[in-house]
Design a protein with these regions (language model features):
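Long terminal segments
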Residues: 107, 117-120, 124-129
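A short loop-to-beta-strand structural motif that recurs across blades of beta-propeller domains
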Residues: 34-37, 81-83, 123-125
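Conserved beta-strand positions in repeat-built beta-propeller and related beta-rich domains
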Residues: 25-31, 72-78, 116-120
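Ankyrin-repeat and related helical/solenoid repeat scaffolds used for protein-protein interactions
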Residues: 65-114
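Beta-rich, blade/repeat-based domains predominating
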Residues: 8-24, 56-69, 100-112, 121
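Intrinsically disordered, low-complexity linker/propeptide segments enriched in Ser/Thr/Gly/Pro
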Residues: 1-7, 26, 35, 39-41, ...
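A short beta-strand motif characteristic of beta-propeller blades
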Residues: 2-7, 48-54, 91-96
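Short loop/turn segments that connect beta-strands within beta-propeller blades
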Residues: 39-44, 86-90, 128-130
């Protein structure tokens, strides 16, 4: 059965979601510039959500992906960067993209790699994680 789960941030502009190995749902919020996580094990209320503001000036988070180590990757358009978020430490690392206006709309990967198709440049970047 499917059910609608609304992020708690008003008009957040959710763009992409990805789940981790624990079944938590990670959400890229374009309008708010947040990375949010919903934990269904905690129910449907406000306490089932956690939210982190992406670093940088006026962030816009578009795509999100969780790798095989449960590290969360997010594309941040305003600062043309990839964000690496460690849920354990709750810290972001910022990785600038090598080409202007990469505009990553979807992130994929396999163990040891994160694939970044750049819709703005028609390149594919790969980050080696292992």
């Amino acid at each position: 059965m499917s059910r609608i789960v609304e992020p708690p941030t008003q008009r957040q502009g959710a763009r992409r979601v990805w789940s981790d190995s624990r079944g938590r749902i990670w959400v890229a919020e374009w309008n708010s510039g947040n990375l949010s996580m919903h934990d269904p094990a905690l129910g449907m209320g406000a306490n089932s959500w956690r939210t982190w503001k992406a670093p940088g000036a006026d962030p816009h988070v578009y795509a999100v992906y969780v790798d095989d180590q449960d590290i969360v990757w997010a594309a941040e358009w305003s600062n043309n960067a990839m964000l690496r978020f460690d849920p354990g430490s709750e810290k972001f690392a910022v990785i600038p993209m090598p080409r202007p206006a990469a505009n990553i709309r979807q992130i994929l990967g396999r163990p040891g790699e994160v694939w970044l198709p750049e819709s703005g440049t028609e390149f594919i970047s790969v980050i080696k994680t292992g």
